[in-house]
Amino acid sequence: MDYDDLINQAMKQVINEENKLQHVNILIAGKSGVGKSTLINAAFRADLAQTGMGRPVTKEIQLIEKPGVPIKIYDTVGFELDKKVQKRTIKEIKKLAKEKRKNAVPDDDIHCMWYCVSAPSDRFEDIEENFINDIAALGIPVILVLTKVFSKEAATQLEATIRLLKPKIHSVVQVLAKDSELVPSFGIKELVEETCELLPAS
């Protein structure tokens, strides 16, 4: 899959023609081991999600970007979902969102959050739902990304379970960001398209 063509065709068209934005700013969060780094690397077509590759924005958040790619990702570093870290992360996100909105420049806003859940884990905890709802309350729409989808049947069952809880999410996207031995990668295009739907109107 040519991610560069995929992103440039699906996203740049929306950005340039409809919104006049230069970048889509995405917050990404999730437990350790859910595949955030693989997802980020797939979006950028490069191994950027490594220690030291991002630029620190706050203690809990780092910015990952690549010249020529119309995406900026704010990665919640070390987000382990315990109450203390969750509270601190929410505080930092609120501060970041408010600072961006002060500029009154849509290009600076946080346009959405990708919240990642590992499909094979078959778990979605109350603390995750609360975190998502807190982010949505800031006016940041949330796309729930089911990662590591080696079995679409199992992922669909988990998605149904999550939807019954009615978290404040815009949509759910199933993704396998990197080819496995048996299953080719998929879902990045759909994730990009869902993200484009959340961009502000011009």
Model-predicted regions and their roles:
Residues 1-83:
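Conserved G1/Walker A P-loop phosphate-binding module
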